[in-house]
Each structure stands twice: as C-alpha cells, then as structure tokens.
C-alpha cells in the first residue's frame, strides 16, 4: 500500500517555462475601461516588445490603440499563454475557446469560483478537468497574474522592480504591500506569481519552478492553504539543498485556529505548531509579519551564516547593551562571557572604563576613536567562542548629517571599511543596530551585505535568521494498514504490546463473577477502568491502587451503578516509583498528514502544556531530541536525587507508536497518555483512539 509520503516521492515536476518565457501572449477581456482588470493587465503586458501581444475583445475593434481579435481562436498561429480577465459567467466558454486554439497556459484572473461556494468549486473542478484533457495548465483562478522580469513578462496589475527574489503569494493585496517593503529593504523581484485558488498549478509547482530559475536566489511565500503539505516540504527542501532560502508568511495559523478536539493531543495541537514543525523539517524560515519576512529575506540572501547561538554584543553605552542582550536571549541566543585571552586583548585596544566581558561596552571610547569599533569587531570575528556579532547603538552617527561630535566622519567611514573588508573575508555574520541607518558609514557595511536596522528588535531578528537552518530527518515511508473498524481500548492494548511496548497485565470483565476470576489470575494492587470512555478520570471511571479483591469488587459495583459501561478492564498496578508520565499522540492533519505530539503527560497534560510536535513517523533519535527539548526535560535526566529515566526505551516506544499512528490515517486522534517512563523502561498505561 502507499505510504503517506508516496504522493510526494512520486511527484513529477511540471515544466512551466512557457508561463515565464512564452513565445506569444493574449489578454482576453482587454478593454479601454481603466477600471477593469483587462485594461490594467493589457497595459502592463504592452510594456514589453519582446514577443507578440494580442488583445482579445469580442465587442471592440480596437483597444489601447491596437487592433483586437474577437476570439482567441481567431489569432493566427495561436498563442502560448492567455490571460483571462472576463466575467465569471463567460469564463467556461472562454476557456473552451482558448483550449480549442491550442493555448498552453491559462492565467485566470476571474474570481467567483472555488473561493465562493460549493457550486463555484464544482465549476472550477470541471474547468480543470478540461484543461488537463487538452494538455494545458492553469494558474488561478482568482489571481492577480504573473511577472518574470528577466524575460519581460508583465502580466500583473503592477510593475515589480527587478531583483533576485521570487514572490509566490496567495493574496494579491498583500503582494502589493510587499512591493513597498521590498523597496524599503532595497530588494527586488525575479518573478511574481499570484497563486489564487491553486486549482491546477499549485504552490509546490511554483516553488520547484523557482528553484530551477537561474535568476531567483530566494523565495518568499505568502500562503493561506498549503494543500499538499508533504509536497511543500519536499519542494522547499530542494530549495534548501541549492542554497536558495525560503521564507514563509502563513495566515490562519494562530493557536485560536486549533480545532475542537476529543483528546488532549488535539487540544494541544494548533495549526501554527503543525506549520512550525513542517518548516523545521523543510529548512524554511517561518515569519509572522511582512516586515519580518523582509528581515529574513535580507538575512538569508547574505552569504554569512552563524553555526551557533553565541553572540558578542558591541556598544558604546550600557543601555543599548542591556536591551540587546535581553532581546537576544529571548530569541534563543546566549551572550556568554568572553575568554580571559579575548578580554585581555580587547582591554589592550580600549580605555580603562570600557567593559570587555560581553557585552563589550566601549563606554565613550567610540567618540574618541571610531576605529575602536573596527579593532573590537576584527578581534571578535576570529574568536572561536563567538558565532556572530551585533553592534548596537550610535555607530553610523559620526558620519551622519547631524553628528553628535564633529570631525569624526572620516574615521568612522574608515572603520566601516575596515569592518567590511574583514567581514567579507570570513563566514560569521555581523549585524548592526544603528540610529543612523542611512549614513555613509553604514552604506560601506551594507555594500558587503551586512544588515543594518534602526530598530534593535529587527537587528536581533536578522541575526536569528542568519543562523544556519538545518534540515530535519524526513519521515520514513510507512505502509498503510487495513482500517480497524470500531477499535476499542481492549483491542489497542494488545496491539501495542505486539509492537514491543510494555503494557500492564490485563483482564476484561463484564460481571462480578469475572472480577473474582481475574483476582485469581494475578495479584494486586489492581487498577479498574470503565471501557468505552474517552476521559475516564473525569467521570470516576478509573480506580487506582486497589489492594485486594474486596476493594476491587467495591469499585466495580460503584462504577457499574454510576457509569454502566459495557465492560471493564482490570490491570496490575505498575510501580511508578521515580517515573515520569509522558503523553504521545498522533493526529491526522488534512494538509500535512500524521502529526506526532510528545509532552509531559498524565491528568495535568493540558495544564502543563509542555509539548513539542513533529511530522510522523519519527525515528528513535528524533524522538529522543523531542523529549530533551521539553521544558520538563530535567525531570527525565534525574532531578534532586532522583535517578534518570530510561530515555532510550522511551524514545524507541515513541518511534514505534508514531509509525503505528501514521499507518492508520483513519485514526483521527491516537493517544497514549500516560506512557510511564521509569529508570528501567517504558510502559503504556492508557490508550485511546478517536475515529
């Protein structure tokens, strides 16, 4: 049977070159009415004389001073790409006309289909079926168009300044906003595609095409619906492998979007966390705002990367040092004390009141000698205990039009040139927070790709995106198992045991006589559970540590009276001395497939909310890393005299359970809570499935 990744592994990249460098173009719906898309796009298309541009209008002989054709089929020799800007009621016939004329690619601006209602979605599906039957391809509908600057293809509402970034956006208006941001950050576009409803050509296809585009050095994405999440991961990993950074701004992924769930796992799993897990796996930078998207792009395009999180902060004032350090640590960086040898060296380069531990505070020496910045940075860049450097504060001000101190402009520019030369010759990133980002000194640094920001939080974000992103281990392909209908707790516990994971000794009972027989089968203390309940503890359906048969019978009578379950499970009470309860859950995400959650478990799972996510299945090493990334990881390693738990057994159990959950996509939620991990092993104490 096919595994969850089989669709990804069998994906055949589509040749979309004709969209980005067509031999000829037609704009259907071209008009002189400046308020209509047909006018706006036709006017943009005519900016280039590289290829024939045909205007199609069934009612007018001339548009924009050029002769028109009544139908696409009337165009002699046909066209490669047609942009359709027609009313939705005319779209179906227009597409049939285009396909009959031999068009290879359709860019459908028209809205009012799949994004509106089920009837529109059905029409959209029928259109795509006809497009495929004709061997053509379609971008959209409900899109803003396409631009390829290198090939002079201008089929969108606006001009996009040339550059090296491919922008793939599901929102037209956000793309227009990003134009302003790109200009502010001195970046430009290799190409732009408004992906619209992704009825045919998808985000995955366009990522793959952009990876192969020699003019594209980075890919920026705004997406509201990933569709095939695993396909997205595969395509983004291709970009990572050829060193083209991918930055994603994803909408509709807040914690408030978490679905109503029957299990703890579902309640703890938000859309945002799933997307974060997918982006980690793909080596993708995930951002929250258009501004951060620009910061991440700028950082990703510069060639220097930090291989660690140790930052040296250089300032000429204590306030900037304190704020910078706090923000860095909030982003997962450390600002460690420099080695004694580095402190001695820096002390020899500065004056007595300077602080050289880290942060390095020049304490006013910068206005005595701006070259002191270069002296410090040059030394720190070769320090093996430093991964990256942040200058924060006044640097850049001495060469500005309104300097604090006069006559230091040439020295500051000289210092900037020295730093630029030093930075260019090595691999560690330098980032600058400055009150004067437009000064000549900062221009020297910007010329070699050193990011400079007016806001300290932007500078710290830039450093964060300069850290080397690493690819996670791609989940193995798993064989899907035959669905198990109506699976119960009594079925699941033996199934887990058959996979090599310990479970308590158990008997299923229905009446008092069977309870008495069970007490003769094994000794207590006992656990009694009412079967068929999702949250047994909440309704008194679990009784723990029952010492003997008499206590067991009392609890059985109570549960049968109060709950009335069809069956009950009697289990041997497992010794939990020095144990830690873990939750292991697998949910089925409609875009990304099986998602694994690991966290601190038991009855306080949703209170503690200490959990991490990964796409399933995972191997034992990845499971171990997940456990160690929990805030409560010290509990696993031994705490206040307690022995460490058997982490290897826990990791192996999690890996096995992740494969089991991934192999049963009909299990919408599959949860083991708790998995008791002790110094001598791991035991599944409870399990549930929601279909």
What residue ranges belong to the model's regions?
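Catalytic-core regions of core metabolic enzymes
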Residues: 1-691
């Amino acid at each position: 049977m096919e595994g969850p990744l089989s669709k990804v592994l069998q994906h055949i990249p589509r040749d979309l070159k004709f969209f980005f460098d067509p031999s000829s173009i037609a704009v259907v719906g071209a008009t002189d009415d400046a308020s209509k898309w047909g006018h706006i796009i036709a006017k943009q298309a005519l900016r280039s004389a590289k290829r024939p541009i045909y205007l199609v209008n069934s009612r007018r002989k001339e548009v924009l001073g050029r002769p028109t054709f009544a139908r696409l089929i009337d165009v002699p020799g046909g066209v490669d790409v047609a942009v359709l800007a027609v009313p939705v009621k005319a779209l179906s016939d227009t597409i049939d006309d285009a396909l009959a004329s031999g068009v290879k690619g359709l860019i459908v601006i028209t809205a009012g289909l799949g994004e509106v209602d089920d009837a529109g979605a059905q029409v959209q599906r029928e259109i795509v079926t006809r497009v495929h039957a004709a061997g053509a391809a379609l971008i959209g509908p409900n899109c803003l168009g396409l631009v390829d600057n290198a090939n002079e293809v201008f089929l969108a509402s606006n001009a996009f300044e040339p550059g090296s970034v491919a922008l793939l956006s599901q929102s037209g208006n956000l793309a227009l906003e990003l134009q302003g941001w790109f200009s502010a950050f001195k970046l430009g576009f290799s190409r732009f595609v408004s992906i619209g409803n992704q009825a045919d050509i998808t985000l995955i296809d366009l990522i793959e095409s952009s990876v192969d585009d020699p003019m594209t050095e980075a890919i920026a994405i705004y997406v509201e619906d990933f569709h095939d999440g695993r396909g997205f991961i595969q395509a983004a990993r291709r970009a990572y492998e050829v060193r083209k950074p991918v930055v994603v701004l994803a909408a509709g992924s807040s914690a408030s979007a978490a679905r109503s769930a029957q299990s703890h796992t579902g309640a703890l799993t938000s859309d945002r966390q799933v997307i974060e897990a997918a982006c980690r796996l793909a080596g993708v930078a995930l951002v929250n705002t258009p501004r951060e998207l620009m910061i991440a792009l700028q950082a990703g395009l510069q060639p220097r990367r930090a291989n660690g999180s140790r930052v040296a902060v250089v300032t000429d004032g204590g306030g900037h040092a304190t704020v910078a350090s706090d923000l860095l640590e909030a982003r997962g960086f450390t600002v460690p004390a420099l080695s004694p040898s580095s402190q001695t060296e820096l002390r020899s380069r500065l004056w007595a009141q300077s602080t050289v531990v880290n942060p390095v505070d020049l304490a006013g020496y910068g206005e005595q000698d701006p070259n002191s910045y270069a002296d410090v940075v040059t030394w720190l860049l070769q320090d093996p205990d430093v991964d990256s450097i942040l200058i924060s504060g006044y640097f850049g001000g001495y060469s500005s039009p309104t300097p604090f101190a006069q006559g230091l402009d040439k020295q500051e520019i000289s210092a900037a040139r020295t730093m630029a030369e030093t930075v260019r010759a090595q691999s560690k990133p330098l980032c600058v927070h400055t009150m004067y980002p437009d000064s000549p000194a900062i221009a020297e640094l910007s010329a070699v790709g050193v990011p400079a920001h007016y806001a300290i939080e932007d500078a710290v974000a830039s450093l964060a995106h300069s850290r080397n992103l690493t690819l996670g281990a791609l989940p193995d392909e798993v064989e899907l198992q035959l669905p198990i209908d109506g699976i119960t707790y009594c079925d699941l516990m033996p199934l887990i045991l058959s996979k090599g994971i310990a479970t308590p000794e158990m008997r299923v009972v229905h009446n008092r006589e069977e309870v008495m027989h069970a007490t003769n089968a094994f000794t207590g203390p006992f656990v009694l559970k009412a079967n068929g309940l999702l949250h047994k503890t909440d309704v008194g359906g679990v009784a723990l540590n029952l010492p003997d048969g008499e206590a067991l019978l009392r609890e059985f009578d109570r549960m049968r009276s109060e709950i009335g379950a069809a069956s009950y499970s009697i289990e041997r009470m497992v010794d939990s001395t020095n144990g830690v309860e873990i939750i292991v859950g697998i949910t089925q995400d409609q875009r990304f497939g099986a998602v694994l959650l690991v966290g601190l478990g038991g009855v306080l799972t949703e209170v503690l909310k200490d959990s991490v996510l990964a796409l399933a299945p995972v191997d034992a090493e990845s499971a171990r890393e997940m456990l160690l990334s929990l805030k409560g990881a010290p509990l696993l390693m031994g705490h206040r005299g307690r022995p460490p738990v058997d982490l290897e057994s826990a990791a192996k159990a999690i890996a096995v359970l992740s494969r089991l959950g991934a192999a049963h996509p009909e299990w919408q939620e599959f949860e083991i809570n708790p998995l008791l991990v002790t110094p001598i092993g791991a035991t599944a104490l409870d399990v549930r499935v929601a279909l």
